[in-house]
Amino acid sequence: MGLLSILRKLKSAPDQEVRILLLGLDNAGKTTLLKQLASEDISHITPTQGFNIKSVQSQGFKLNVWDIGGQRKIRPYWRNYFENTDILIYVIDSADRKRFEETGQELAELLEEEKLSCVPVLIFANKQDLLTAAPASEIAEGLNLHTIRDRFWQIQSCSALTGEGVQDGMNWVCKNVSAKKK
């Protein structure tokens, strides 16, 4: 097989599929983040009843992102989506300090789930465009993220509204998917 045919084969190779679970409390900005990733209009977003799925191409991967509603009544159903998850993205509203304890509890429970064991987790500290937003370092400390030892994790400041920090987070996702998939 010549070099040219090898290159053709590589070029035609389909992108590797990655299953990403996008979770967080209601109003954290999950759907806005997903639409930002898909370069879609973010001016009219309503609370997610159930789930949204979008596929996004990034760095040779086809990222299949499952955005699951975060309302309290929907959260018990999150576990129905855990199977075969490659990466967990957890979104936090950095400006809603009254809910830090609640979001921390939900994240802690997710990290205890057997079907999510060893799954890398990216925590987006969202809404950094708001003056009242807590910095990612303060959130990381408050959630005791430094105690996570059984998986790769990253906290990333972002604004789903402006797009700032979103690509940095997705670069981390792609890097950790390639490490996991090898």
Curated annotation (Swiss-Prot):
Main location class: Golgi
Lipidation (N-myristoyl glycine): 2
Sites where the protein binds Mg(2+): 31, 48
UniProt-annotated location(s): Golgi apparatus membrane; Cytoplasm, Cytoskeleton, Spindle; Nucleus; Cytoplasm, Cytoskeleton, Microtubule organizing center, Centrosome
One BP annotation, GO: protein localization to ciliary membrane
Binding residues for GTP: 24-31, 48, 67-71, 126-129, 159-161
Keywords of the record: Cell cycle, Cell division, Cell projection, Cytoplasm, Cytoskeleton, Golgi apparatus, GTP-binding, Lipoprotein, Magnesium, Membrane, Metal-binding, Myristate, Nucleotide-binding, Nucleus, Phosphoprotein, Protein transport, Transport
KW Lipoprotein (keyword) present: yes
Modified residues (Phosphoserine): 5
SS bond list: none
A single MF term (Gene Ontology): GTP binding
InterPro entries: ARL2/3, P-loop_NTPase, Small_GTP-bd, Small_GTPase_ARF/SAR
PROSITE patterns assigned: ARF
Cross-referenced Pfam families: Arf
Membrane topology value: Peripheral membrane protein
One Gene Ontology cellular component: cytoplasm
Keyword Transmembrane helix: no
Subunit structure: Found in a complex with ARL3, RP2 and UNC119 (or UNC119B); RP2 induces hydrolysis of GTP ARL3 in the complex, leading to the release of UNC119 (or UNC119B). Interacts with RP2; interaction is direct and stimulated with the activated GTP-bound form of ARL3. Interacts with SYS1. Interacts with ARL2BP; the GTP-bound form interacts with ARL2BP. Microtubule-associated protein. Does not interact with TBCC. Interacts with RP2. Interacts with PDE6D; the interaction occurs specifically with the GTP-bound form of ARL3.
Protein's job: Small GTP-binding protein which cycles between an inactive GDP-bound and an active GTP-bound form, and the rate of cycling is regulated by guanine nucleotide exchange factors (GEF) and GTPase-activating proteins (GAP). Required for normal cytokinesis and cilia signaling. Requires assistance from GTPase-activating proteins (GAPs) like RP2 and PDE6D, in order to cycle between inactive GDP-bound and active GTP-bound forms. Required for targeting proteins to the cilium, including myristoylated NPHP3 and prenylated INPP5E.
Similarity comment: Belongs to the small GTPase superfamily. Arf family.
Protein name, as recorded: ADP-ribosylation factor-like protein 3
Organism for this UniProt entry: Bos taurus (Bovine)
Gene: ARL3
